[in-house]
Amino acid sequence: MDSIVLYTEEIDDLEEAVGELFTQADTFALKKNTLAVLFAEEDTDYPELYKLLSARWDFPIIGSTTMAMLLAEQGCCRTGISILLLTADDCAFAVGMTDDLNKDHYREEITNLCASLQKELPTPPKLVLTYGGMVASEENVPGDEVVSVIEATLGKDIPVYGGIASDGFSFNNYRVFCGDRTTQSGQAIALVSGNIDPIFITTNSVENRADVTYEVTKAQSNKVMRLGTGTFIDALRRENMEVSKQNVVGDYFLSPFVLSIDLGDGDISEITRTLSLLNLETGTGVFLGEVPEGSILRIGILNRKDVQKSVEQAFGEILETLSRSDGKRRTLLCHSCAARFLAMASNTKAEAETYQSCLPEAFSLLGMYGNGEFCPLRGEKTGKNHNFFHNFTFTIMAI
């Protein structure tokens, strides 16, 4: 599979922006099948952008808004439009998006879309690329549930990779893109079949934790009702944490909740979760991802040093792995947690500077900062990849 990354910082004059993107792609040879992965800042007029792009491009586009992009040459960019073109004669793409999802019908929506897309492919899919919206209300669907339904429809052996749309920390201007459609709570999905064998790396950036621990004594999916003998909010109040309002994702963005989770087949992994909402009437906490009943919660502390270390670890591992492979994988798609960007404070280019110093020239790289990451997680006991939805991680897919 061949690839190229296109970028323009222009978003006000979209005709000029699209002209720049087309010029950058002029010498790039498109093959039989092509997919565009697009990230843009929240103020981008995507419907107009798509109209201009589709006047020349007849292939599918999938992606989302993001608070910042990662590129090989430019590094970290908070403004603009970026596009990764993936093209191949021996791969096929099937792309679509659900209607807005809620807890009542998300299973049917995702199942029907995956089944429909699978029928469009000449051979079984080998990769799922997906983008969705964050949990901004109790009716929104967490990423874990999305993964569960995709696996139930397509099988657990097909890797799921992607991210959750973000914005400039308003947490209400994010959007997901697919073709000419935009959404805040739908799920965009691309299935890829053919000659593709992706490699995945996931690193966690939370190493420091507070001493206090709580057992989750009542929970359902991403909702935690009780910690120990009291409500979830009671426990937060005892720790002098924010409990006075409903939408608290911004207040807890740098205070991840750390827990261990059973991945299956004997694999246990430590993960982190972001608190998004508080139900002040019931005392419930709503997270961006699942928190299993019976797990032990600890409050983590996200800092610049740990963020930098995890990026160095991720790129060191992926480049070492690729150096031992057949040399055909030259495209890197990265997803980093938006909280990591915030933790870097004034040094927001640190993640980009880490990979820019070691990335081979022949590689294409595009990344985004999102409010969650879909990426297989390798079990320490079995070495098996488990599809998983993350918070506070840095992930890489090499194809």
Q: Which role does the model predict for each range below?
A:
Residues 1-35, 40-60, 64-332, 337-345, ...:
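Small-residue-enriched flexible segments
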Residues 361:
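ATP-binding catalytic core of ATPases
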